[in-house]
Amino acid sequence: MVKGIQKISQINEIYTSIYRLIAFFLILLVFYSSIIKAESYAVASRHHIATDIGIKVLEEGGNAIDAAVAVAFALAVVNPSAGNLGGGGFMLIHLAEKTETISIDYRERAPIKSFEKMFQDDSGKIVKGLSLNSIIASGVPGTVSGLFYASEKFGTYDIKDLINPSIELARDGFTLSSFQAKNLNKHKQKFSKNKEAKKIFTRPNGFSKGDILVQKNLANTLERIAQNGKKEFYSGETAKKIANFFQNNGGILSFEDLNQYNLRILNPVCGSYRLYEICSMAPPSSGGIALIQILNILENVDLSSFDHNSEEYLKILISAMDYAYKDRAEYLGDPSFFDVPQNLLTSKKYAKKIYQLIQKEKMPAKATVNILESEETTHFSILDKWGNAVSNTYTLNTAYGSGIIPYGTGILMNNEMDDFSSKPGYPNAYGLIGSEANKIEPKKTPLSSMSPVIVFKNNKPFLITGSPGGSTIITSVLQEILNILDFQYSLKESSKKSRIHFQHLPDILFHEKFEDNLIKSLNKDRKLMNRKLGEIHSILLKKDGLEAFSDKRRPDGKASAIYK
């Protein structure tokens, strides 16, 4: 009996030791997992040099906002077609410690001397090209203001240290890729109209892969900004150079415009979709409202029950896009000038009514308004080891903006005034019809489709994403979200899936590579256009680590995820 008890006791001791050992390893596993999480960070952007600069900032202890500022300044040098000092954009920031998400509107504003009919002749006809390639095509730039605000408010680095790599890149030059060389040559005529742009961005025999692009005046401007701060761009020597150039060449952008520029801190537009929360930009971006509206409509059906990109799946997408873009045109504009019914447009109840109409195959009547912006925009996504996240989209509008560089600055200026309705009820430069909500007014912000997005799961960033692509930004980002949330694709798998785009007007179905029979079944007498759609740069947090990916629809992009 005693021996039996001793044996049981020994067995208990063995089990106790095993349990303790298991507990010990579990503690180690949890501890090790926390270390992995604490050392994880990622950057995805359009240019490999900018991504590398961002990764270095994160490696050396900077946070996501520090890296974002460094990446944005770098893209102004190595991606001159869209990265910029002379443009504007939107930045979405998630602060992990505060569990707070804020957005910065640093988009361009209309100059004080702007007026509704400024791109019309005396007879009321639109003067072709005036809103795109002329001295009056530029809005007041907001990029420098936005980057300084983000750095000063949320960053940890001295901004000089974040700008210095870009100064060196501009002064010493960087190697052009084949794509960049061809793109510069393609826009030679645009640059030829401006003395400094012609000197920097053209060659007698054109650029070739491997050529070095040097931008000394831009380096000098960046150096002054690093030394003197934001005031250098808005009231210092650089501001005077910009204002004097415009005033001396028949422009309307003035020193007063620069001096009075103010960014806006906005509450993001957020909504729930299945088990996730999606946050994006509020107006003057149309992206947040349109995305939430479409997702609300689609939430009424189990998309995962369809085969991906099947006829049934694409039909419901096209219908939801149709309604959202109709509302975008009719109801969205700068909220400082126009009463935007945001709560209505993003409500589940409103989406349910639309879905019921779609079920009855009732499509919205072809309205008389819509807006299209250029495809030349750029996006980057960043996550740091503390869980802070940045999703940023900024632009010059069309490629290289207006093609105008104020003498001595090296700064390409935007042509963002074309994003306004040059004449309500009349087609703009892209063949689309403008709305009263987006008419030109002094100090007003033009409507945009830029849609920086952060998707949350359990109150933590799950997907950080965004894209260039003009009015196709919204639908490109939408399909990235659906691919990942509904179909559980990886970022790489998602990028390989063909995309569609439909925006109510014009009545054209834009599509990538699909089978002919499928496209014909979706046609319904619409015009068809086969083209690349979007250029996604995303970061995805997975159970087993991080995935970062830059869309291969355009070369030169790079995504880096460090998961130690």
Q: Language-model features: where?
A:
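Active-site rim segments in enzyme catalytic domains, especially the processed small/beta chain
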Residues: 77-94, 98-103, 252-254, 389-457, ...
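Short beta-strand scaffold segments in enzyme catalytic cores
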Residues: 84, 88-95, 378-383, 452-454, ...
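Internal maturation/activation junctions in enzymes
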Residues: 301-395, 409, 424-425
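Bacterial N-terminal signal peptides that target proteins for export
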Residues: 4-23
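Noncatalytic scaffold domains of N-terminal-nucleophile
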Residues: 36-52, 56, 62-229, 233-235, ...
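Extended C-terminal subregions enriched in glycine
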Residues: 444, 477, 486-531
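Bacterial N-terminal signal peptides
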Residues: 22-33
